[in-house]
């Protein structure tokens, strides 16, 4: 009997108590509640950057098109080197659609272009999470280089951010 009690006393108890485990879970919850919104904001901003880059790339292609066809711009994306363009084919990671608008097009309704010119608009895909971005809903640029954005953030915030 004495031998058993000597063995038990020489081996300390191992493991975590319930309180220690609850403290760790509480700390992890606090860290996640801070980290996840920050991460989502970062992701949202990177997708905005992708949309702005696509709009500016397409505007550059329009200007190159005009240099070889000096009479008019085009609203046909295939003429600009884009294939698979349209409502069923979002650009980049798949969060935005690009639209090329001529003066006769009403798709770029907030800022329709004047004649002869163009306007390019990136709008979020309705089924993607970027459609919930209320600050910067859509991005557009016209043939004069003027940039526009819709959403609560406004043009200066959305194009500067």
Locate each region found by the language model:
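N-terminal leader/signal peptides at the extreme start of proteins
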Residues: 1-16
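Residues at secondary-structure transition points
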Residues: 13, 45-49, 53, 109-113, ...
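Alpha-helix exit/C-cap motif
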Residues: 45-49, 57-79
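Internal alpha-helical transmembrane segments of multi-pass membrane proteins, especially GPCRs
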Residues: 14, 19-23, 44
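Periplasmic/extracellular, small/polar-rich flexible segments of pilin-like filament-forming proteins
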Residues: 2, 67-161
